[in-house]
């Protein structure tokens, strides 16, 4: 790899790449600075005028479940440096960065992870053929001939590949189709979450950045949706640079790559990844510098806006009226001929899978609560309620239980419309709807938790509790139906605008865009940071099509299509104090209503013995994990930190992989004294491990008493890369709190 990079990315070429990157970044950041003032004004105006969607009926979780481990298990990873497959212990913490450890013992002994993968911008592939097609398209002229050795050989029939158009790729495989399905759901959840990297609560910086991206691309005649608007600001900015830099680099270096087609493909992936990392570091520095400059200027800008808000609004409305008079006749004709006829079909294509997905969310929530209620009646009663509710609180973050909801969006197609409206991919809309589904599920669960916690304060009997659970479920479902309708209608409006506005702007550009500079003289110089002609022009275009979009969504609601409420229907708040309940301390179900020591069978004395107490602590630790497919690896042999076990020969069959896995487990652990029951908790060593002092980033390790559960921050998906962050051998390892079940057993809800 080093030879490839030193040959094709020498100092002169790196300098050339840095200069081109600098030019692109400088041009984009001018757009960002312009949009920052507009976004700040819009945000402050919104606060003062109080405009916004109707108040939601469901509560939302203000304190996220940030101590949860989403998933953990074993999988095989292909090591590109030695071309071997290695078994890795992997987990996904609450921040959705895939963390890969050498093995489970390394994780338990707090050895730094091998890698932390930020999956923003990646695609999850389940077929080597799919992957080879994408790789072949990325570098024309390198398609392998029939019968030749491909770039990747998978030893099983169940691969999972993380593919990125610019960054390095990751190769995994599983032993069974069931494992592949589980990991696919988990990795898709990681991608979905990491793609949504700009915080929702960023009311100024976020909108300014996305508007700047759109304006910059439109200045390059690139309209329509952009599939690589993925990740945080620096990742998106890196994608933007690579979109321009990549083709020229490919044309320059592609013909110089030597070897067979698959070898040239491998070389190009290495080069592209190296360039992407260079671009990322440069983009990060530039973006942070500009952001700091804008934040320093923000107080002065806010003072001007507060003082002159009315004058700024008047000036903007005057400008809008002049632009409207100029473009309205052309815009209305364009809307009538090219957009209006297609709005119903676009809306129908969006409504069917989206509404099916939200209905599935409702059904899954209903089933989980009903099953819990039956368990309360038939098994544990109030004593087990804490355990049941601890699991229910994690429902929205359970990749497999939510998968049936997310899958409803997969059939979304805009056949015949994608080319007309320049929609490069429907993945933008799929992921947005799926994120809404997860949010609404969590809101429903949290509202149910809050109402049930209030009911428990009355000290109900088991029978009264079951009736209360059913009554609360019905109340929450009514609130869910209302909020679901509001969220879907807003999603439909936004999606229709996202599809039609770029198309209209592109259609109107030849006759209108060149005339816009003459409107600049209508803006007072003092207000020029808060009013831009280009933005006002886009708002006027939006208004010309907005009435047709609103009418189409309204008609769908009037027809009661897909269970949408009419705009005139307002659900009166039957719980006036409900939102006050959400202001309290987050509910810890395990602590407040957990099992007091009687696990439902056998003798239980007055106070638990030390082993029982340890088991209880372990149970509570396990309750904080959403799901697991962890192999049993109890530690029994001494473990040498930082020693890489010798790599075995590359296995080419399932049998060899099974043998490799068995060898790893024997080397890392002694066999349990007796077979573990299905789903039984695995006893883990509670002995604290001495870790030598090291450099940041991790916080100093405290000495903990034996048996004390450690609950510190897990590794975060690094924003300094496109894919992987490898911890240095000397750095202090992050510590996790997790729970694992016996071999191959998923944590049951």
Swiss-Prot record:
Subcellular locations according to the entry: Cytoplasm, Cytosol; Cell junction, Adherens junction; Membrane
Q: Does the keyword Phosphoprotein apply?
A: yes
The processes (GO biological process) annotated in the record are: gonadotropin secretion; negative regulation of apoptotic process; negative regulation of cell population proliferation; negative regulation of DNA biosynthetic process; negative regulation of DNA-templated transcription
Composition bias, Polar residues: 723-749
Q: Compositional bias of type Basic and acidic residues: which residue ranges?
A: 710-719
What is the protein's known function? May play a role in apoptosis suppression.
Similarity section: Belongs to the Niban family.
Q: What is this protein called?
A: Protein Niban 2
Source organism of the structure? Mus musculus (Mouse)
Gene that encodes the chain? Niban2
């Amino acid at each position: 790899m080093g030879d490839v990079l030193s040959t094709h990315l020498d100092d002169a070429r790196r300098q050339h790449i840095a200069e081109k990157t600098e030019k692109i970044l400088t041009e984009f950041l001018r757009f960002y600075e312009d949009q920052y003032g507009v976004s700040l004004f819009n945000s402050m105006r919104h606060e003062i005028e109080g405009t916004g969607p109707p108040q939601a009926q469901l509560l939302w979780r203000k304190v996220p479940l940030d101590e949860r481990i989403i998933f953990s298990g074993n999988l095989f990873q292909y090591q590109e440096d030695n071309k071997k497959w290695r078994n890795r212990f992997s987990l996904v913490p609450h921040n959705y960065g895939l963390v890969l450890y050498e093995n489970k013992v390394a994780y338990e002994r707090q050895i730094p992870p091998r890698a932390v993968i930020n999956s923003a911008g990646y695609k999850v592939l389940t077929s080597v053929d799919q992957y080879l097609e994408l790789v072949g398209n990325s570098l024309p002229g390198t398609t392998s001939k029939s019968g030749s050795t491909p770039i990747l050989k998978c030893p099983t029939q169940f691969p999972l590949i993380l593919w990125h158009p610019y960054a390095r790729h990751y190769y995994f495989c599983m032993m069974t189709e069931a494992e592949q399905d589980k990991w696919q759901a988990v990795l898709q959840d990681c991608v979905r979450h990491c793609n949504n990297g700009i915080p929702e609560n960023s009311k100024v910086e976020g909108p300014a950045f996305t508007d700047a991206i759109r304006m910059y691309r439109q200045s390059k005649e690139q309209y329509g949706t952009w599939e690589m608007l993925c990740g945080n600001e620096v990742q998106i900015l890196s994608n933007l640079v690579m979109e321009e830099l990549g083709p020229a680099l490919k044309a320059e270096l592609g013909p110089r790559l030597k070897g067979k087609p698959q070898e040239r493909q491998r070389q190009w992936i290495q080069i592209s990844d190296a360039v992407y990392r260079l671009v990322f570091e440069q983009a990060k520095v530039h973006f942070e510098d500009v952001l700091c400059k804008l934040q320093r200027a923000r107080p002065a800008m806010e003072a001007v806006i507060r003082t002159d808000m009315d004058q700024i609004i008047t000036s903007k409305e005057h400008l809008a009226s002049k632009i409207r008079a100029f473009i309205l006749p052309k815009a209305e004709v364009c809307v009538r001929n090219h957009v209006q006829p297609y709005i119903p079909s676009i809306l129908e294509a969006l409504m069917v899978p989206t509404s099916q997905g939200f209905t599935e969310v409702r059904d899954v929530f209903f089933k989980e609560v009903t099953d819990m209620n039956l368990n309360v009646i038939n098994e544990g009663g109030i004593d087990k309620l804490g355990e049941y509710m601890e699991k229910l609180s994690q429902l929205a973050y359970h990749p497999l239980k939510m998968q049936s909801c997310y899958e409803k969006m997969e059939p979304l197609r805009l056949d015949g419309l994608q080319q007309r409206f320049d929609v490069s991919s429907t993945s933008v809309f799929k992921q947005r709807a799926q994120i809404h589904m997860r949010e609404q599920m969590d809101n429903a669960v949290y509202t149910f938790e809050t109402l049930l916690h209030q009911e428990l304060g009355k000290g109900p009997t088991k029978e009264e509790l079951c009736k209360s659970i059913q009554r609360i479920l019905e109340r929450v479902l009514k609130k869910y139906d209302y909020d679901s309708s509001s969220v879907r209608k807003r999603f439909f409006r936004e999606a229709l605008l996202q599809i039609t506005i770029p198309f209209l702007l592109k259609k109107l550009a030849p006759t209108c865009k060149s005339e816009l500079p003459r409107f600049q003289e209508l803006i007072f110089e003092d207000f020029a940071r808060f009013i831009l002609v280009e933005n006002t022009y886009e708002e006027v275009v939006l208004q010309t099509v907005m009435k047709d979009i609103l009418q189409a969504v309204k008609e769908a609601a009037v027809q009661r299509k897909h269970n949408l409420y009419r705009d005139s229907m307002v659900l009166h708040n039957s719980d006036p104090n409900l939102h006050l309940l959400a202001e309290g301390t987050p509910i810890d179900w395990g602590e407040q209503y957990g099992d007091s020591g009687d696990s439902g069978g056998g003798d239980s004395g007055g106070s638990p013995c030390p082993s029982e107490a340890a088991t209880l602590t372990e149970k509570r630790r396990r309750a904080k994990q959403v799901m697991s497919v962890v192999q049993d690896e109890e530690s029994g042999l001494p473990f040498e930190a930082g020693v890489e076990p010798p790599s075995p020969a590359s296995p080419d069959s399932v049998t060899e992989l099974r043998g490799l896995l068995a060898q790893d487990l024997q080397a890392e652990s002694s066999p349990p004294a007796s077979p573990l029951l299905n789903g039984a908790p695995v006893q883990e060593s509670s002995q604290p491990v001495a870790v030598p002092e090291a450099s940041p980033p991790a916080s100093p390790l405290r000495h903990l008493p034996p048996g004390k559960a450690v609950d510190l921050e897990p590794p975060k998906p690094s924003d300094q890369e496109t894919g992987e962050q490898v911890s240095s051998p000397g750095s202090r390892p992050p510590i996790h709190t997790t729970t694992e079940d016996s071999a191959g057993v998923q944590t049951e809800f």
